Amino acid sequence: MPPKKKKLAGLIKLQIQAGQANPAPPVGPALGQHGVNIMEFCKAYNAATESQRGNVVPVEISVYEDRTFDFKLKTPPAAKLLLKAAGVQKGSGEPHKTKVASVTMDQVREIAKTKQEDLNANDIEQAAKIIAGTARSMGITVDG
């Protein structure tokens, strides 16, 4: 007989600094209410994201009824990557009136390559259009 599939008890989505997960909020309370071993998750997450330090890395944690878990790392949010490329701290409060910075189309394509697996796009050009739209909504102009 094949082994039984684990039954999913919950799905938790978090955005945590790479290599810096600790039991303090927001990680501790989110995992604690599902009965997951918090330190075990923190050690596994920190080891998996060590190479991406400095970025916020979203994670999707699947918690099973026997309190075991596994997690899937996503790519950093497009907004964070755009802010880093533009060299600014935050986007514009009124993006259609006040522009805070500009990025080149090459930078947008580079971000699109990074984000491709998480975007709903068939090729790099479509992904670049999605990223350019995000940039415009943040008050960042796209040159080129």
From Swiss-Prot:
An example Gene Ontology molecular-function term: structural constituent of ribosome
Keywords: Methylation, Ribonucleoprotein, Ribosomal protein, RNA-binding, rRNA-binding
rRNA-binding listed as a keyword: yes
Post-translational modification: One or more lysine residues are methylated.
Pfam families assigned: Ribosomal_L11 (PF00298), Ribosomal_L11_N (PF03946)
SMART domains reported in the protein's UniProt record: RL11
Gene Ontology BP term (one): translation
GO cellular component terms attached to this protein's record: cytosolic large ribosomal subunit
Subunit structure: Part of the ribosomal stalk of the 50S ribosomal subunit. Interacts with L10 and the large rRNA to form the base of the stalk. L10 forms an elongated spine to which L12 dimers bind in a sequential fashion forming a multimeric L10(L12)X complex.
Job description of the protein: Forms part of the ribosomal stalk which helps the ribosome interact with GTP-bound translation factors.
Family recorded in the similarity comment: Belongs to the universal ribosomal protein uL11 family.
Protein name per Swiss-Prot or TrEMBL: Large ribosomal subunit protein uL11
